[in-house]
Every structure is written in C-alpha cells, then in structure tokens.
Amino acid sequence: MRLLYFSMVLLWVLGASECQVIPSSRRTLRVGIAAAQDTQSGSIGWASCGGTLPIAVQYLKSKGFLTDFDVEYYMEYTECDRASVAKAGMKFMKEMNVDVVVGPSCGDALAIMGTLSAIYKKLVLGWGFVSDTQLADTNRFPYVASVQPTAQTLGLATSRILEMFQFDRVALLYYKDDQDYCKSVMDDVEATLSDPDLYPVRIVWKGELQSDNEALTRSTLQAVKSRARIVLLCAISGPEKRNYLISIAQQNMTTNEYVHILLTMRSIGYGVQTSLGKKTFANGLTPLWESFTVAPDGNETNARRAAEKMLVIDVNSDVQDAEFLQYLTKNIADAVRNPPMKCNTSECINASSTSMGSYARHLFDVFYLYGMAVSKLNSTDPTVYGNLNLLMPQMVTSFDGMTGRVQIGQNLYRVPTYQLYGLDEKYEQVALVNMTFYNSSSQLSRGYSDEGRSVWHFWDGTRPLDTPICGFSGRYCPVQFWDQYGVLIFVASIVLIFLICIMLMCFGFMIRGRRAEQERLNSEWQIPSIQLIMPQKEKRKPNSRRSLQSGPSTITGESKMTIDGGFHENYTVQMFEKDLVLTTKHHSMQMNKEEKEKFVKLRKLEHDNLNKFIGLSIDGPQFVAVWKMCSRGSLQDIIARGNFSMDGFFMFCIITDIAEGMNFLHKSFLHLHGNLRSATCLVNDSWQVKLTDFGLGALLEEHTPSKKRLLWAAPEVLRGSLTIHQMDPSADVYSFAIIASEILTKREAWDISNRKEGADEILYMVKKGGNRTIRPELILDAEVSPRLTTLVKDCWSEQPEDRPKAEQICKLLSEMTPRGNTNLMDHVFNMLEEYTSTLEVDIEERTKELTLEKKKADILLSRMLPKQVAERLKAGQTVEPEGFDTVTVLFSDVVKFTQLAAKCSPFQVVNLLNDLYSNFDTIIEEHGVYKVESIGDGYLCVSGLPTKNGYAHIKQIVDMSLKFMDYCKSFKVPHLPREKVELRIGINSGPCVAGVVGLSMPRYCLFGDTVNTASRMESNGKPSMIHMSEAAHSLLTDHYPHQYETSSRGEVIIKGKGVMETFWVLGKTDSDTKSLSTRTTPPITDENWPPQMKEDLKKRAVTPYPERQRSGKSKMDTLKVV
C-alpha cells in the first residue's frame, strides 16, 4: 500500500506542470541547481541523483511539509568547474534571486559558491564530495549547510578505533578519482592521526590505487605486505571496493594477520546502492561483494571471504524506512526524465533503473532538511520564510533520513555518529562500536561484551597484531632458545632435575600421606559389599542310607529374634566382621564431596538413643547402609506382635528415649531426622530405643515412599511433597506424636487395621486439613498421665509453628518423670521375671522344632527329586517337561539276585540291599550323578540332567560304573561270606526328556528311546561287565580319547532294536604307564564265543527274561519305555 501511494504521488508530480492550476495564495520556492553531468557520474551525476528532488518534495508533502509551496527548478551544469560555478552562482543569486542553491557537489566548487552566498546572503545546500573541514567554518561560509560530516571527524573516529584495538602501525590506501576526493579525505585522516595530542599512530605507507591499473594495485599491495598488517582504505564506488577485495584475496592478504578498515562517510557500511545483487541488507542496500553486473563474474566467493577480514567505519547507516529507500532507488531515473525535471540529455535518457548515485540519498536528506525548516518558519510567519537569520536556526535539528539518523549542529554541518561495522556468521552487517563527535569531544560505546567472539570471530577469536612477531620479512624471529642457552640449560637441567626429583619425592610422600588419610577416612564408612554376608545355616549332606535323618543345625550369632524374620521388611540381617548388623538397601547415586564428608561425620555421631551408623557399601548394584544390630527389632514390630505388656512407666521411658534422640539430631549438623517412624525406632537388648535411618538424605529421596509410610508424614510435607532437604524439624515433631500414639494405644499407627478408612483416605484428610483435622484416636489406660497426652496433641498441631521444639519436649518429659522409677531396665526385669522361664523358652523350642521339621522335609524331598525341581515345587510352580540333547543313562542289576535272596530272610535281604546301595549312593555323590530310582536289585542313574554338563556325563557314568565294579569285588554279604555279589551294567547316551509325573507321590521320570536302549544294554550284558552302546562309546572316545580302554563286542541282536554293535568298558588307562588302573575280565568276542553261548544269546534276544526279572522290572520298564 505504501509503494502504491508513492507511485500515485509520482504520477501526480509528472503531470503537475501541465494540468495543475496554482492558486494565487500559494508561494513558490525558486531552487537553483549547480549540477554535474559527466563528473563522477556514478556518484554525483545528475542523471543518477537529480530525480531525488521531486521525490523529496512529494515525500515532504506526504509528511505535511511544503503544502503551501510550489517548487521551481533552474538548472546549470557546472561540472565542478570553478569558473562555471562562479558564473552560475552570480546568475542564481544576483539575476534570478533564487531562494536556495543546491550544489555544487565538489569541495573546491562549493567553496566558491559558499563565498558568493556570504555576499548575497543566499542559502547553499552542499552534497556529494563536500567533506573538507574548511567548509564547516561558519566565519568563512555562514550560509552553507550539508548533511555530510567533515573528514576531520572521520580521522578522529579512526584514531579512537586504532587506540581501542592498540593498533599503532598502519598503511593508508585510496583510489584515485577525478575530484581527488579520497586523497583529500586521506590527507585529513593522516593529519588527524599525526596529531601529537591523540593516540600515536605511525603511518608506514600511503599509496594510491587505480581501478583500471591492476599492475599498480599488485605492486602497491606487495609493498604494503612488507610494511603493515593494518590497512586503511578509501574508495568511492562499489566496483572499486569489490575490486579491492578480489585483489587482496589474490595477494593472500586475507589471512588472520590482516585487518582492512574501509573509511567512508556515505551511510552505507558494507552496502552498495544497486538492485542487481541477489542479497540485500536490512537497510535495503546490496552487499559490496555481490556482482554489480547482470551476469555474475564468478568472484563472489573470493570477494565475500575477503570481506570477512574487513571492518567499516561509516556514518550511522541505520535507515528506518528501508522500503522507501528501495522505492527511491527504482524510481529515481524516471523522476529525472519526467516533469518537473524534464532532463533530456543522453545520460538522463539512458539512466539505469536498477541503481542510483552514491550521494543521491545525501541530496534527498539535505533538501528534506531545507523543506522542513521552511515549513516550520512558514507556519509561524508566512512572510519571513526567506529570512536566513530566522531560517537557519530552524535547520539545527535532527531527523531520520535516507542516510540514517541526521543531526545538524550550529555550523549547519552534520554532527556525525560513526559506527564500526563488522559481519556476523550470517554475513549481516552489525554495529560493533558507536562514536559521536562534537566540538572536538567524543563519546564511544561498545556494542559487544566479548571482543573475540563479536569483532574477531573471522580471525578465530584473536585480535591480530599490527606487527608480526617475526617481523614483516620473517627475519626477526627470536633466536632459538636452545642455540643461545643450550649449555647453560644442560647444566641447569641437571641441577633442576635433581631438585625436581627431591621435590617429587617430597610431593609423593605428601600425596601418599593425603591419600592414606583419605583412604582411612573412607574406610571408616565405606564397606566393601563382599564383607557383607548372609548368615548361613550349617547343613549336613544327606545320604541314601539315612535319608530321613537330619543332624542339628546352628545359626551364627546371637539374637533375640530370628534372622529370617522379626524385623521390618526394610531391614536385612547380615554378617559384618563376625557380628550381626542391620542393612537397608537404597538406589545407587553419584555422591559429591559434601555427601562423602557427611558420612564421615555421620559415623562419628554418638548418642545413647541413636543407632550406630557403621558405614555404607557403594560398590554393588545398590547402596547398602549398615547399622548396628538391635536384637529386639523395631518398635513397630514389637507393637504389632502384641505379646509384651507395657505399663505406663515403660511407655513413658520409650517416648522419652525417642524424644532425646530426636533432640540430639536437631542440634547436630543434620538438623532433623526426616524419616521418623516406629519402624525406624529400634530396641536393643536393654530395651533402649535407638533411632536409625537418619542422615541418609538423598539416598532416601531416591525411594518412592508407600502410602503406609506416609502415615507418619506431617501435613505440610504431604501438601508440598517436600524432600528431606526441604523439611523443617517441626515435621519430625509431628512424626514423634504419631509414634507416641502407637505406644500409648499399643496399636499400629492410626489403628489402620481397625479403621474403616484406608491409608489413601487418611492421607487425603490429613493433607486437606481445615478446622476439623483428623488425628489418631487416643484410647488410653488410666495410668497414662494426662499431661503426656496433652503434649502429644500439641506435637501434632496443624501449624508447624504451633508445635513445641524437641528441646521443649525433652524438658516437659523430664518434669513428668515419676518419682522412684528412674531405671527402665530394673523396671523391665521386674516385669519380665514372670515371662522369662516360660514364654521365650516356648518360643525358642517351637522355633527349633519347626526348623528341624522343615529341614527334615527338605532333606526328604531332595532325596526324591532333584534340588532344582524340589525348589520349584515348594514355590508352588509347575515343573514343565524339559528336553536334553545328550545325557548318559545307566542301568545296573545284581546277577542271580533271586538265588541269593532265596538264601536270606526278608530282613537280611533289606539289610543287604541297604548296605550295598548306601555305598553306591556315596559313589554317586562323588561323581555328581543323579540317582533316578532303585527298585529291588535294579538301579537307574543318569548324568547330564537336570543340570547340563556338556559331554562330561559320559565320563561321570563310566567312572562311577568302574567304582561300582571295584566296590562289588570287596563287598561281603555278612551272613553269607562266601557269596560274591556281581553286577551287570548297561550304558547308553542320547537325547532324553525328563519331567515330574503325578501329584500324589510325584516322581522325576525319564522318557525316551535312550532309556530303553540303556535297559537293553544291561539285560544283554554279562556279569561283572560294563556294556555300552555304540553312541555312548563314540561319545567317550571322541571327548576323552586314550583315557579308557574299551573293546568291541561285535554285532549283537537287541530286542526291539535289531542288530547293534556294542562295546565293553575294560578300565581306565593310566596316562603315565599306559596300563589299566581298573580292569574287568577280558571280554568274550564273537570270534572266541563257544557255539552254545551264541545260541543262548539268540534265545535271550527273542525270549523274555525269567519270571523273576519280569516281575522285578515291571515298574521300572514303565518309567523307561515311551
């Protein structure tokens, strides 16, 4: 909308001269213009700048200025020629009597026009190259006004910047132009920098550059490289600045050693007035590294990287109306060609619509300044708007123009606000320093806090030096230190090493001492987790012969309560340094130095009513706090059991103990307990209450407390969810009152088991508070003092400030002490005399009986089932069948047992088998084999289940079989000493399934063809021989080669299997002598078998066992065969 408005205004301007009828009451401003057509056309040429005047007039009218004025323009092209300027000045001022003269835009020419203005008392508006300091002299040029600052102020700003960065060695470079503008500026800057009253700066090189002479530029830059690292540059046009960036990039002058400072007074900073660039700054200008042609030249990257090493000192360029500046740039060419300018020269006709002259914005601002002053004076008195004595004070003002913030001083020249510009990471120009100069005084303010990150971030954060460390030629590097002082260093090094060794030794001893002291302090409270062990019960291994017997078991340590129970669930009884201790587990956390120092103090905390903190174990998955054992358990447990009678004095002493412990904690470095409950009040052998779980701080905060634990929490803690570090000691007083109510009523907290409200409802009502607060009901005995109950009620007051202090509680309790009863132990002993001989004895005896019976039951169960299976059954879990890839099964049978049994009585048979199998059971335990069952004279064992052992099962079975054979050789039947007991053993290896069968009298049974084949190996074996299948033989020889001697039996017809090759186990090979450590009778092979034996074998393969074998093995076959 704003651009549309200005477009409509411009169209109105272009047609105003032909269509508008001027009323007689309007006044006309006659403006004489001394313009340049060919001189510096890109900067002050009328074709690129003149269009700003009609646009400025309409902009003034849009702001409410010059509304009663028409403007007439009278043009003279003086080209900055002195004679032409003098002629035009005489014409404008003497003949035409204009109101104001605009221009000329060159310094020398403006001096002539200013001289004429002093004679004819006409106002002259200076713009362009008019920064000479002499033009601001009001004595010589009283009627010259300009929005340009003087070059002297630029020199002062440069001096302050060099002083701020401590740069005292610089080079000055400037581009040559037709009017020698940059040379004049650099002369003023050089003169200012040479002022002895200012910061001393040495100018080591001053050179001229030419935009069309690259050779001169290269040679000049090479000369600068050998003399300076801080370069001050003056350039007029954008192409000159860009060419300089490309040149220093080519000469490798864009390293971190160089700082290039562009000096300008055109309020453009890093910008250029063109609309061809791809990027624009916030003020509407195009960055100077962008290409100024329609087709980019490919040097944008190099130019931009060179711009990183450039700073800019310029007049404040913060244009407030960037949108209008873009509008001015695009429409200035049309405005100069159309009425009222009507410039019809070839330059005007061919003027570019994409850019404007460098000083066009200054022409706009200086005429805007004049228009405002005329309007203000006209508003007061329309007849005196041309009176310079009245007009000039109106021009001493400030406004936001197209060149930034403009402030005009008493000399009608601009009071400059210079800024040091730099580039940020996004290549946006930022103001780093603001400098204001007026009447030789200056004010400087930094716009950054970190110089390295703000000013020198393209220099890796380090301010460059104006002189390299090694000089400009690199010949002045310091002499190598070793070359100069080598011998001295060698001698000094020996002495120094010797001294260092002594110092290191001393330092080492000191460090060692400190470390030892630190380790000693840590060892006081840090307990290795390996030193905390659970109290073990001594057990005897059960055997087959005495499967129902159990030896006595003892529990280490002495306690009034059992180790497995009797304490609150948060406590665990463990052994530490042969003493029973109480432990609590906590989440692990990272402890700081303060926490560790607190635990050192905590361990040293001693009081009769505080439980001793022994230490903390921090090397396990959880932290474990270790406390001294209090054998009678917690106060909560004692109250819950309800088997101890407490009279009034006893309850009073318990409450007093708690109060004394709490008071001591409140006066200590801990200041409070923070977790006070009846569960944290332990009772020792002497019936003395000791507070525990204090001082753990952050460890307790890691836990999420249960609802029941919060029953002791104060209302303010519940409402604010306060941590221990945020709690007040009054919260402990509230918890003390709840514990006291438990003691006085002899019931658990809040009598929760008998209340209709649950824990959640009670906590909600406590947290809610109000006039009718909920508290535990005190149903008391007659012997309880009313003063004590009153104290308890005061302690659980709703407001923390209404609760008494712990010290006051102790004082009040001491005043309530009953006379004549001062020793709790005497009182307790008297009270417990009647229970000592009965109650505890009965409890201990029943406990022992229960433990003994449980042990017997466990032993009996372990005899029937594997330990793992028994544990799962005791836990009520279902035992699923489990498959095993490879196991070894053994069947054994007593040869001619029927005949042997016929010679014995039934009791003798039982004793015979018991003696035989008891020793077999011992052999089984030695080899880690599991005995499945024994039925009659049959024996079934397996290895590899229920615990898998790789391939060791074949070795264990074979070794056990050889032991069986050895034992049978020496076994004697007591009542038949001449009879010899022989075994027939069969072995097979393979997969198997095992599981528990039945609910009543459950048995651990084996299923699978592996079991059946092992049975066939036994039934087809020979007396005193170990018969194994080919699968078992392969497993034995593959995994234990050369350890056992075996022999092939050859192919044998096996019932249900057909022809199988089987093997005999002869014995175990001694690896040193290659002899047999155990050897059975040499086998009979198919080659040396008698014909009668072969026939017998065939009959046995197809004929069932005798009746004794079938009847004796019927139950076992049920378990073996699937």
Curated annotation (Swiss-Prot):
Sequence ranges of Basic and acidic residues compositional bias: 1107-1122
InterPro entries the record matches: A/G_cyclase (IPR001054), A/G_cyclase_CS (IPR018297), ANF_lig-bd_rcpt (IPR001828), Cyclic_nucleotide_synthase (IPR050401), Kinase-like_dom_sf (IPR011009), Nucleotide_cyclase (IPR029787), Peripla_BP_I (IPR028082), Prot_kinase_dom (IPR000719)
Cytoplasmic face residues: 508-1122
Extent of Polar residues compositional bias: 545-559, 1074-1083
Compartment(s): Cell membrane
Entry keywords, A to Z: Cell membrane, cGMP biosynthesis, Glycoprotein, GTP-binding, Lyase, Membrane, Nucleotide-binding, Receptor, Signal, Transmembrane, Transmembrane helix
Location, primary (coarse class): membrane
Residues carrying a glycan: N252, N299, N344, N350, N378, N434, N439
PANTHER family listed in its UniProt record: GUANYLYL CYCLASE, RECEPTOR-TYPE GUANYLATE CYCLASE GCY-5
Protein family (similarity comment): Belongs to the adenylyl cyclase class-4/guanylyl cyclase family.
Domain commentary: The protein kinase domain is predicted to be catalytically inactive.
Protein's recorded name: Receptor-type guanylate cyclase gcy-5
Species, as recorded: Caenorhabditis elegans
